[in-house]
Design a protein with these regions (language model features):
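Bacterial N-terminal signal peptides that target proteins for export
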Residues: 1-7
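N-terminal accessory segments that precede or flank the first globular/catalytic domain
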Residues: 2, 18-44
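Bacterial N-terminal signal peptides
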Residues: 8-15
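N-terminal post-signal-peptidase region of extra-cytosolic proteins
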Residues: 23-28, 34-35, 52-81, 123-126, ...
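Exported/periplasmic cell-wall-interacting domains
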Residues: 25, 85-185
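Solvent-exposed coil/turn segments that connect beta secondary-structure elements
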Residues: 35-37, 44-46, 54-59, 82-85, ...
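Short, solvent-exposed loop/turn elements at domain surfaces
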Residues: 39-42, 50, 61-65, 87-90, ...
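Short hydrophobic/aromatic-enriched beta-strand-loop microsegments
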Residues: 49-52, 182-184
Length: 185
């Protein structure tokens, strides 16, 4: 390979790595306001981007989500997965259930010690927590895919995720990175 090619390749890698590091260094995070039905991207405490008319779980929200309840979990999470092509257009998975959710569920008898330990170990290792426990899983932010925009605008229709239009999720993809903080309130 020529020296010029290698220098060009190195320059491109530095630009891409620098862009990713810049996103993380600015303390960029997501706030989902389920009362106002708005998702905002913030840098510190300054709002950089807002997406209106989001949809949440068809049964509302809860601090204590259970598998199949169609509710969006409340709390503080991290993005653990970025899938650019899914049936819902794009999917940005969060680390639900968190240790806080698992602790409350253990105290309430919703899960046993074995599930609590599995969730605790996964979160501690910064891995995706088990998704098949009685607390449910596969929660994230996604588009509507081939779904109807009119239904999205009028109804909360998800099984617990946060949904944006495909155009909104495409725009949001410029901001997201694995490890990004997501607050759902």
């Amino acid at each position: 390979m020529s020296r010029r090619f290698l220098l060009t390749l190195l320059s491109l890698l530095l630009v891409v790595a620098g862009d990713s590091a810049a996103k993380q260094d600015l303390d960029t995070w997501i706030l989902v306001d389920t009362r106002k039905m708005v998702l905002s991207v913030l840098e510190g405490d300054k709002v950089r981007r807002t997406y209106n008319d989001i949809a949440i779980g068809r049964a509302g929200t809860t601090a204590d989500k259970k598998q199949g309840d169609n509710k969006t979990p409340l709390g503080e999470f991290r993005l653990v997965r970025i899938a650019p092509k899914t049936p819902f257009h794009r999917f940005f998975g969060i680390d639900y259930p968190t240790v806080a959710h698992a602790k409350r569920a253990l105290r309430a008898g919703t899960i046993g010690l074995e599930h609590y330990i599995e969730i605790y170990r996964a979160i501690r290792a910064q891995a995706i927590p088990p998704q098949e426990t009685p607390l449910g899983g596969y929660i994230g932010i996604h588009g509507i895919g081939e779904g109807e925009a009119a239904i999205h605008k009028r109804f909360n229709w998800t099984q617990g995720c946060i949904a944006l239009t495909n155009q909104q999720i495409d725009d949001l993809s410029r901001w997201v990175y694995v490890g990004m903080r997501v607050v759902i309130r």
